[in-house]
Amino acid sequence: VSQADIAAVQTSWRRCYCSWDNEDGLKFYQTLFDSNSKIRHAFESAGATNDTEMEKQANLFGLMMTQFIDNLDDTTALNYKISGLMATHKTRNVVDPALFAIALNELVKFIGNQQPAWKNVTAVILSQMKIALSSN
């Protein structure tokens, strides 16, 4: 991933994240759930069955994305964060890489700007997620 892509993603995420906890996070999750029943089912089976729980999950997702995006310049730290997330998802038996791809693609569409840079960055994140899911 180029430094220009990293800078574009970091800048656009910081703008989006300013209203993530108050508004955009829940909007994103509602859009995500409406777009894919498998994603909805995965979250509902983990307990996100109402707006309060969805908002809680959205806030956690925002924090996780912030950690990923803040570490785009540090491959070791980024891989560590991704591996930790995948380990947690393995304990919940959420191991289908397609679900993570859907979520990341929906995030790219939701953010709306800097899409080529976001696609490059999320491709790297998804690749590392697949590696982490396949490891023991």
Curated annotation (Swiss-Prot):
One of its GO terms (molecular function) is heme binding. Coiled coil: none annotated. It holds the Pfam family Globin. The keyword Cell membrane does not apply. It comes from the Eukaryota. Heme b binds at residue 89. Keywords: Heme, Iron, Metal-binding, Oxygen transport, Transport. The keyword Transport applies. CDD domains: Mb-like. Residues 1-134 form the Globin domain. Belongs to the globin family. Homodimer. This is Globin-2.
